[in-house]
A protein has these predicted regions:
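Conserved cytosolic headpiece of P-type ATPases
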Residues: 1-191
Length: 191
């Protein structure tokens, strides 16, 4: 995020580990950038992670399971967001989108997927101080390249507020005016 590069410890789907920024534990309440990013990857997610017979298992896509585990480590409860509509992941689009109402009543479109596809749909980004700024595509592309060079699978997150009366979601709703929130690099284990 523009708020910094967070590190996440732990392995597998077990929700144990820390989220840190510059070596210090990062709590969602004090890190709005992190909260916004985790909200997207947790809520726009149809995979479940649960403990069965002492083992943490994923029901759904492994990458989505890693994102769900991240949200558990952060203490984020995706169940508090009511989903109204969704556009499932398709390989042609390379993203997933949902229309949700947050606990505070804000209705948002949440979008996660391939960074290049999301960058194409954003004109603004969440700035370092939490304000909206013009999208700096070169900045994000450099970070995408750096994460990819480390062998990580890179995903991006974006969102935007919509009218409280909006109850449907179409591809046209994602064409532009999304706000870019940041990137996530995931260790992609060999298959």
């Amino acid at each position: 995020t523009r708020g910094g590069a967070y590190d996440v410890s732990g392995t597998g789907y077990q929700p144990e580990g820390d989220i840190t920024l510059e070596g210090k534990t990062a709590r969602l309440a004090q890190h709005g950038h992190l909260h916004a990013l985790i909200e997207v990857v947790a809520v726009a997610n149809d995979t479940h992670v649960a403990e069965e017979d002492g083992q943490w298992k994923v029901t759904g896509e492994p990458t989505e399971g890693a994102l769900r585990t991240l949200s558990h480590k952060a203490g984020f409860d995706a169940e508090t967001h009511e989903r109204h509509a969704s556009i499932p992941f398709e390989s042609a689009n390379k993203f997933m989108a949902t229309l949700n109402t947050a606990p505070g009543g804000q209705r948002r479109i949440l979008l996660k997927g391939a960074p290049d596809r999301l960058l194409d749909r954003c004109r603004q980004e969440l700035g370092a101080a939490g304000e909206l700024e013009p999208l700096d595509r070169a900045f994000w592309e450099a970070h995408i390249d750096a994460l990819s060079a480390e062998g990580l699978r890179v995903l991006a997150a974006a969102a935007r507020e919509v009218s409280a009366s909006k109850d449907a979601l179409a591809l046209e709703d994602l064409e532009e005016d999304m706000v870019f929130l940041g990137l996530i690099g995931i260790i992609d284990p060999p298959r």
